[in-house]
């Protein structure tokens, strides 16, 4: 004769509390992870473990001015070897090569250049307090000459790719596309949401804007590189047909504007920058 077991008592206080809202959120998160997978990274770039908001450029250099002008943080050797010209504007960042390479002086742009195999490496010793407004024009000209006339792939970097290198990239966009600081900042920010120069650097860009206007009083600026590219490609100024070497993937993650830039007011007419906050 079978023995009857006592009824099993379950105390609800011992069970984890799972609300209907949490169940829906978990289901939504699971379905989201199935639908969206990270884009593959080319073998020339080290894969980031988990991209997060504190890690800029998780997928490698970002193309700011197609097809061959890129912005990045401190590059590794495999990344450097993917470019023809590297411009490092961080004083504290040293090149990763084992030797000092071959040196020569670029008299056209007044720059000292190191050459490693096919790579031209320019080290500009800026820190976050450097007054660089007067240096920007020769660097912008150097970038335009190599990328747009010689059709080389150019990387601009600093330690984090946020401040100093971003300033040089913004300066290039200002002069090349004839934009004021606000619009050039927005152009770069849309392509690299991690940038965020401090106000001291922004004011130096504003000073550079006045230099551009002073030097181009006879109308909108066009560099000699742009003019030659125009003659060669019959009006296709911005996008040469064949890059010098293989293209990197375009990465344009979307994010909200930084709190610093929301305080900047567009001034298309005057070109100056002002703070909304008192």
Swiss-Prot record:
It is an enzyme of class 3 (hydrolase). InterPro entries: Dual-sp_phosphatase_cat-dom (IPR000340), Prot-tyrosine_phosphatase-like (IPR029021), Tyr_Pase_dom (IPR000387), TYR_PHOSPHATASE_DUAL_dom (IPR020422). Keywords: Cell cycle, Hydrolase, Protein phosphatase. Its EC number is 3.1.3.48. One of its GO terms (molecular function) is protein tyrosine/threonine phosphatase activity. It comes from Schizosaccharomyces pombe (strain 972 / ATCC 24843) (Fission yeast). PROSITE patterns: TYR_PHOSPHATASE_2 (PS50056), TYR_PHOSPHATASE_DUAL (PS50054). Coiled coil: none annotated. Dual specificity phosphatase that dephosphorylates MAP kinase pmk1 on a Tyr. Has a role in chloride ion homeostasis by inactivating this pmk1 MAP kinase pathway. The gene is pmp1. Residues 252-278 have a biased composition (Polar residues). This is Tyrosine-protein phosphatase pmp1. Residues 60-214 form the Tyrosine-protein phosphatase domain. It catalyses: O-phospho-L-tyrosyl-[protein] + H2O = L-tyrosyl-[protein] + phosphate. SMART domains: DSPc. GO terms for biological process: negative regulation of cell integrity MAPK cascade; negative regulation of MAPK cascade; signal transduction. The active site is at residue 158. One of its GO terms (cellular component) is cytoplasm. Belongs to the protein-tyrosine phosphatase family. Non-receptor class dual specificity subfamily.
């Amino acid at each position: 004769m079978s023995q009857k077991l006592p009824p099993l008592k379950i105390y609800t206080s011992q069970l984890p509390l799972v609300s209907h809202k949490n169940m829906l959120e978990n289901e939504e998160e699971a379905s989201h992870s199935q639908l969206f997978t990270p884009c593959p990274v080319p073998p020339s770039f080290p894969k980031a473990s988990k991209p997060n908001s504190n890690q800029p450029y998780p997928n490698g250099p970002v193309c700011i001015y197609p097809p061959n002008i890129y912005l990045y943080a401190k590059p590794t050797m495999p990344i450097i070897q993917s470019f023809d010209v590297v411009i490092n504007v961080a004083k504290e960042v040293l090149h990763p090569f084992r030797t000092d390479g071959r040196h020569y002086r670029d008299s056209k742009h007044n720059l000292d250049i190191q050459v490693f195999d096919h790579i031209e490496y320019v080290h500009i010793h800026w820190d976050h307090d450097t007054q660089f407004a007067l240096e920007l024009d020769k660097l912008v000209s150097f970038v335009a000459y190599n990328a747009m006339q010689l059709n080389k792939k150019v990387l601009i970097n600093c330690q984090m790719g946020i401040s100093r290198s971003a300033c040089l990239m913004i300066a290039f966009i200002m002069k090349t596309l004839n934009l004021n600081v606000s619009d050039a900042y927005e152009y770069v920010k849309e392509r690299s949401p991690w940038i965020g120069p401090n106000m001291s650097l922004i004011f130096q860009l504003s000073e550079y804007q006045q230099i551009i206007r002073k030097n181009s009083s006879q109308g909108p600026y066009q560099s000699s590189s742009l003019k030659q590219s125009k003659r060669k490609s019959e009006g296709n100024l911005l996008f040469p047909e064949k890059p010098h070497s293989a293209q990197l993937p375009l990465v344009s993650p979307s994010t909200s504007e930084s709190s610093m830039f929301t305080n900047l007011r567009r001034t298309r007419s005057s070109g100056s920058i002002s703070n909304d906050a008192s």
